[in-house]
Amino acid sequence: MSNGKKIFISHSSKDQEYVDAFIQLLKKFGFRTQDIFYSSTIETGVQPGELIFDTIKRELTNQPVMLYFLSDHYYQSIPCLNEMGASWMLSDKHYPIALNNFSMKDMKGVISSERLAIAFNDKTSTNEINCLLKKLSHDTDVQAEPDFELNVEKNIQPFQNKLTQLIRQASYLKPDEKGYFETILSTHRPVYGTAKGVYDCFKLPSLIEPKSLGLDTLSEDESHWLFFFLTWGTFQEGEKVRFKLKKDKAYNNREFSDIGKCKNIYVSYLEKVE
């Protein structure tokens, strides 16, 4: 049984997918819907007919255990910062969680980097996650399900897999509203044979999102290479470029002994960005 203390999830709605995955892990551990306040779903958040700020005020007054999912999105949100300040005054249990690519040096306000509980990234270990769950269990008196304790690694693995998937998706190159991609050219690859003197080739630092290529998924071990006519100009590693994908054929699957599986990415427009 819970001691009445809820877990309060302070987050930006733009990071909801990360939080949704963690909520599923909390429930697998043994937390019930009524043990969690999470405003992004009706079952754990604001009920129909309620005012969100009145609900948040009531929940914070009950001195919940605070989890802050910190990101650039979080610090760009005035409601999130207000929530952080109010909870600091009303609660004595605070667990800041840094999401992927959020630097501790960017932590501001009343929650300092010295208080960081965990960073969710592709290196987060099972032991780190389980340690956080045990602290939350201690603070709320919510006990772990017997099945969870019998196989901690097996039960945490789906969350780690989802975290890795979300991090990978966040790194994808995505176009702007007009269909243009912007990136920095990475490794230059010499072109041989009949293509020499006609084409040039540079590795892209990130994969192009599957959706833009008309795909559902990408291979975990593939790389993407911009393969274009020399008539587009002379380019160097480290230069920032802007391009559009070729509509009739945006890519071609290739495989080489030195770089493995890859896609040649074809463009209909390419320019340097100063």
Swiss-Prot record:
Sorted alphabetically, which keywords does the UniProt record give? Answer: Hydrolase, NAD, Virulence
Catalytic activity from the UniProt record: NAD(+) + H2O = ADP-D-ribose + nicotinamide + H(+)
Annotated TIR domain residues: 3-140
Which InterPro entries does the entry mention?
Answer: TIR_dom, Toll_tir_struct_dom_sf
GO MF terms here are: NAD+ nucleosidase activity; NAD+ nucleosidase activity, cyclic ADP-ribose generating; phosphatidylinositol-3,4,5-trisphosphate binding; phosphatidylinositol-3,4-bisphosphate binding; phosphatidylinositol-3,5-bisphosphate binding; phosphatidylinositol-3-phosphate binding; phosphatidylinositol-4,5-bisphosphate binding; phosphatidylinositol-4-phosphate binding
The residues the record assigns to binding NAD(+) are 12-13, 47
PROSITE patterns xrefs: TIR (PS50104)
What is known about its subunit structure?
Interacts with host MYD88.
The protein's matches in SUPFAM superfamilies, at most eight in alphabetical order, are given as: Toll/Interleukin receptor TIR domain
GO terms (BP aspect): NAD catabolic process; negative regulation of MyD88-dependent toll-like receptor signaling pathway; signal transduction
EC number(s) on record? 3.2.2.6
| Protein name per UniProt | NAD(+) hydrolase TcpF
* Record note on domains: The TIR domain mediates NAD(+) hydrolase (NADase) activity. Self-association of TIR domains is required for NADase activity.
Q: Which residues form the active site?
A: 83
What is the documented function of this protein?
Answer: Virulence factor that suppresses host Toll-like receptor (TLR)-mediated cytokine production upon infection. Acts as a NAD(+) hydrolase (NADase) by catalyzing cleavage of NAD(+) into ADP-D-ribose (ADPR) and nicotinamide.
This protein's species is Enterococcus faecalis (strain ATCC 700802 / V583)
